[in-house]
Amino acid sequence: MHELSLCMSAADIIREQAEQHGIARVTDVWLEVGALADVEESALHFCFDIACRDTVAQGCTLHIDVIPAQAWCWDCSREAEIMQHAGCCPHCGSERLRISEGDDLRVKSLEGE
């Protein structure tokens, strides 16, 4: 379950940002999760609650935005949306793809008081 380590890293980022911006209590957090991040949403919610325990983000509302994965094709030099790690370019059929977006998790924004 790599969700816990991802959430621990996100909690560190949230704590740092809250400290930098003078936020005493985080009320909402938006995470951007790539479609190829291999993250289970229910596990992410569970682990996020654990990671934020005893921090400024404890009890905050977690919002998850799933973003599509993008890959760059080395053969036709075009960007394409992909649904799996091992795929083919929808433009030319090549398997020479480099994932450029959508395989990670990011703290998109947070709100607090």
Swiss-Prot record:
Keywords: Metal-binding, Nickel, Zinc. Zn(2+) binds at C73, C76, C89, C92. One of its GO terms (biological process) is protein maturation. InterPro entries: HybF, Hydgase_Ni_incorp_HypA/HybF_CS, HypA/HybF. Ni(2+) binds at H2, E3. GO terms for molecular function: nickel cation binding; zinc ion binding. Pfam families: HypA. Involved in the maturation of [NiFe] hydrogenases. Required for nickel insertion into the metal center of the hydrogenase. Belongs to the HypA/HybF family. HybF subfamily. This is Hydrogenase maturation factor HybF.
